[in-house]
Amino acid sequence: MNTDLTTEQKDYATFLPALSGFYATFIGKQRREEYVDKSRIPYPSMESMNWLNKKEGLFNYHWSLYSAGHAELDINKDAPKEDMIRDRDRNNSWMLGDSGGFQIGKGVWEGDWKDPNCPKAQKKREQVLAWMDAYMDYGMILDI
């Protein structure tokens, strides 16, 4: 049974559930290895919890948000934990990319963000933009 929440919720404002890195990791890594013991998965597979997978998910929802602050920003690196985002069917899903300003504000991302010439901050800016270009349908570049 697959419930299409996009159709069922069409008369309401569009809600973008924020996909956490932990959630994406469970979906992505399970595609390549037994990351979660199968006895702990109540339905045929972990993929049934992937709302971006219209064919195998228990429910489907077209819209989501994902933050660069949770992402593997090296787009040339194989990252199984990112499979839910990187290998999604882009014809049946839409992802808004957040630029990761919270990580800047909390000091998680190194660099002098007030200095437009800081090499560390500039490298991160370039990574975020490349990541958004590669995997997001729309990006909010507000604070990097």
Give short role names for the model-derived ranges.
Residues M1-I144:
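Non-catalytic, usually N-terminal nucleic-acid engagement modules in DNA/RNA processing proteins
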